[in-house]
Amino acid sequence: MVKPHRSSAARTRITRTLAALAMIVAVNVAVIGCSNDNSEGLVDGVSDKYPLHTNITATTFWVGEILDPTASDGSQVLSTYDSRWYESYGGCDGYIDEGGVCQTEARKASNGYFPLNMTPLENPFYLDLPYDDINNEIGFADRDRVIPWAGEKPYSDHVGDDRFSYMKNRWVAITRGDVTCYGQIQDAGPAEYSDADYVFGTDDRRPLNKKWRSAGLDVSPAINSCLGFPKLDYIEPVDWRFVDDADVPDGPWTEIITTSQVQ
């Protein structure tokens, strides 16, 4: 069977159609490429917008703990951002022993690492970092210069406002091994309160603090158990970085989100 011969006009239409299709494909590829180039990256599922701090010693603390009754910063009945932290949280983040002392307790994945003997009113996934932007004179004076999100709303609406913290309630991703858990900042420490080079630096600076194996953050019992620390009230190396609200995945840490400000 002899195939019919296509006219030159038909061949021209086919050629133009193929060229147009090729151009559409090329444009789509270019658009996708530009989108990827301009989007934030992910490192182990965590946004890399903020620098990663590696191999930082974390200690465990909890609402109601009395670490040193003689020290101005030795009690977790209050925090630098909440003078009624114990009340705001709902009580001892653990249990009261026979001597009336607030103790920590092992947490279980089956209930999202929540406390077993009380019902928290605020997020049990909390931590501190050594930058106090409210009660430390240097921390407050420098916060608009050193805190990366200071120019964003709602923070930019509170310049000079000592009743509004840029640090309180900010999210942090904390990684130990292949496990990442999230928590909100609710206090400042350990031991240092204006260590901007470590907290906000981009060169993986070591903390100024030399106590507790140069600890660079305290984490709550919920974060301790979520990360699989070997023991309660333990010291363990972790990696951490700040995370924007929109980049926090659902998990037990989003069951209760703390929104209260300085009080």
Predicted feature residues:
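N-terminal secretory signal peptides that target proteins for export/translocation
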Residues: M1-R13
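N-terminal cationic leader/targeting segments used for protein routing and processing
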Residues: P4-R6, V29, D37-S39
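Secreted/periplasmic proteins
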Residues: S39-Q263
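Bacterial N-terminal signal peptides
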Residues: A19-A30
